[in-house]
């Protein structure tokens, strides 16, 4: 059987993005957040001399449960639950201009056909409703 890890993240961008409110409503672990015009920091915490051109919020769908790293459907259910908690339309309520559900599948061995998983239809409906693009990347 092929060893793989699955990573799903919801990523939001917008000049008027209310990342604090959005993160609070999603109840997911924030992996990155920045506010338009805020100084960008290097990994060591020092000022890079640049400022964020737009707001951004990235949240992962697996960090609260390590067993989800190999459970695509589990992570998609986490994303579904997070989107169901939203108080209203992304653009109007949170200032979101663009959004993606980013999915990465990392394989140790290249074997076609693994993993096999289903997208919950209710998740797909919410992605369309909120105009969230779906991006899938498969990496060796």
Labelled PLM ranges:
Residues 1-138:
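Acidic (Asp/Glu-rich) sequence patches and key acidic residues
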